[in-house]
């Protein structure tokens, strides 16, 4: 169940000493070929980390032989030296693997504004390269964790081919993408343009529909590598469906491990005039701190849902809005509906349905509650 499950993928992780916990903090995922096609999606934040800028350049060639990922330092807002360090990282991996640095993607996660400990990182690349294995995906997934409490992996099989993936992310989770690093692999034989469309389509309806705290990272990276080792050549829709399943699995694991969360909130907006309206309403509900506090207190406060909807530009009439919480329509036609005491909120997952009664479009956004643990964790996060 890891990123190295597809044929032609190897991986590994090691400890290089940038985490006070002493946990693994450097990961390597390698596409052994015969094909090395790749595509990716990056943060929409205008302040981009050095590894994002580097990897964007690498992907212009449509080929990636390996991805080096470090946790414990974002290498963001580090100026020319930060970019030089990323370049040196790619060069070291290229030398260890026998490839060109122009085919080595780099991803980083951790504290913004600090330089990476290159004296420890570069030897770590050599160590990770020496320990590469088709069974090394789990160790790679463990090595990219920051505030994550669990490592996150997923695999799905097609007809004679498969897709695997790993992800990290627990805080700064918001659309565009979400604060995350994701590496996806497949042994299907597909060209870069096909991979590019597939990964963008998958990200749009999975990672971009996760909104934990409304904060957008400088380092978000989703990479898709295709080895072609299975010889399988699926049609676009077949491949896209499997890829989407893997991304959805990983996205759900991200929200389930969000910092300090005690509730996972599934927000479904239905009967919207457009999909964009549905997404806007869902995101706005997801970011409403008063509602998130109410959910934490197991209070089915539908008024806060309507208040959030009212701040959007979506098409709707206030007197036609309906809201259900865990299946109980607590708001009907813009006013009180069924009794709030009918809503059972004891369980981890809370389902909110917002019916705009304005069209035929819908969208699902995943969020979580706001807790004292979240505040503590982020106030204690060292700067």
UniProtKB/Swiss-Prot annotation:
The keyword Amino-acid biosynthesis is annotated on this UniProt entry: yes
Subunit structure: Heterotetramer of two alpha and two beta chains.
Originating organism: Streptomyces clavuligerus
Region (Disordered) location: 1-25
Enzyme Commission number(s) of this protein: 2.3.1.35, 2.3.1.1
Name listed for the protein in its UniProt record: Arginine biosynthesis bifunctional protein ArgJ 1
Positions with a binding annotation for substrate: 146, 168, 179, 259, 378, 383
Pathway: Amino-acid biosynthesis; L-arginine biosynthesis; L-ornithine and N-acetyl-L-glutamate from L-glutamate and N(2)-acetyl-L-ornithine (cyclic): step 1/1; Amino-acid biosynthesis; L-arginine biosynthesis; N(2)-acetyl-L-ornithine from L-glutamate: step 1/4
Matching CDD domains: OAT
Main location: cytoplasm
Gene name of this polypeptide: argJ1
Positions of the catalytic residues: 179
Keywords: Acyltransferase, Amino-acid biosynthesis, Arginine biosynthesis, Autocatalytic cleavage, Cytoplasm, Multifunctional enzyme, Transferase
């Amino acid at each position: 169940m890891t990123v190295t499950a597809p044929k032609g993928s190897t991986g590994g992780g090691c400890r290089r000493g940038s985490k006070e916990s002493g946990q693994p903090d450097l990961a390597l995922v390698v596409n052994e070929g015969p094909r090395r096609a790749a595509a990716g999606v990056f943060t929409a934040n205008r302040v981009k980390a050095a590894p994002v800028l580097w990897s964007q350049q690498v992907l212009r060639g449509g080929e990636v032989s390996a991805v080096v990922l470090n946790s414990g330092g974002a290498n963001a807002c580090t100026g020319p030296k930060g970019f030089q360090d990323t370049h040196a990282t790619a060069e070291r991996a290229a030398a260890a693997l026998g490839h060109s640095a122009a085919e080595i993607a780099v991803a980083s996660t951790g504290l913004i504004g600090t330089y990476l400990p290159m004296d420890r990182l570069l030897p770590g690349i050599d160590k990770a390269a020496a320990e590469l294995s088709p069974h090394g995906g789990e160790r790679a997934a463990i090595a990219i964790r920051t505030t994550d409490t669990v490592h996150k992996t997923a695999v799905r099989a097609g007809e004679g081919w498969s897709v695997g993936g790993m992800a990290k992310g627990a805080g700064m989770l918001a659309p565009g993408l979400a604060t995350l690093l994701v590496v996806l692999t497949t042994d299907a034989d597909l060209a870069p343009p096909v991979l590019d469309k597939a990964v963008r389509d998958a990200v749009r309806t999975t990672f971009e529909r996760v909104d934990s705290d409304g904060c957008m990272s400088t380092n978000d990276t989703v990479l898709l590598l295709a080895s072609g080792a299975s010889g399988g050549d699926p049609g676009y829709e077949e491949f896209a469906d499997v890829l989407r399943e893997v991304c959805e699995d990983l996205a759900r694991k991200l929200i389930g491990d969000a910092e300090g969360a005690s509730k996972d909130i599934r927000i479904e907006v239905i009967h919207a005039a457009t999909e964009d309206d549905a997404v806007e309403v869902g995101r706005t509900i997801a970011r409403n701190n008063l509602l998130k506090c109410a959910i934490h207190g197991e209070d089915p406060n539908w008024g806060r849902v309507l208040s959030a909807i009212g701040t959007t530009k979506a098409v709707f009439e206030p007197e036609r809005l309906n809201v259900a919480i865990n299946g109980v329509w607590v708001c009907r036609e813009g006013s009180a509906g069924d009794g709030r005491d009918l809503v059972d909120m004891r369980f981890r997952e809370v389902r909110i349905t917002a019916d705009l009664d304005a069209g035929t479009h819908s969208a699902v956004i995943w969020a979580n509650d706001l807790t004292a643990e979240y505040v503590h964790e982020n106030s204690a996060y060292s700067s």
